[in-house]
């Protein structure tokens, strides 16, 4: 009975590895670059008006940032946005 449990555990871990390993290697998770750049523009919660740039899936687009909150798809310049999000 002990060997059956060990074999079951090894089989389970092997299947888990085979299922999750490709996801870990995919571009969607490569150093967070794609995930951040896929976020929508988010103005944030305040009423200030700062010109910022976000990546819209194709290029960087200007938007008005309220000054607080929002998400990480927010860059001070178009150049910074493209450097972070444009595909090589």
UniProtKB/Swiss-Prot annotation:
The keyword Metal-binding does not apply. GO terms for molecular function: potassium channel regulator activity; serine-type endopeptidase inhibitor activity; toxin activity. GO terms for biological process: envenomation resulting in negative regulation of voltage-gated potassium channel activity in another organism. Keywords: Disulfide bond, Protease inhibitor, Secreted, Serine protease inhibitor, Signal. It holds the Pfam family Kunitz_BPTI. It is found in: Secreted. Gene3D superfamilies: Pancreatic trypsin inhibitor Kunitz domain. One of its GO terms (cellular component) is extracellular region. Residues 1-27 form the signal peptide. The record marks 47-48 as: Reactive bond for trypsin. Expressed by the venom gland. Disulfide bonds join 37-85, 60-81. InterPro entries: Kunitz_BPTI, Kunitz_BPTI_sf. The keyword Signal applies. Residues 37-85 form the BPTI/Kunitz inhibitor domain. SMART domains: KU (SM00131). Residues 28-33 form a propeptide. Serine protease inhibitor that inhibits trypsin at a molar ratio of 1:1. Belongs to the venom Kunitz-type family. 01 (intermediate) subfamily. This is Kunitz-type U15-theraphotoxin-Hhn1n. It comes from Cyriopagopus hainanus (Chinese bird spider). The lineage of its organism: Eukaryota, Metazoa, Ecdysozoa, Arthropoda, Chelicerata.
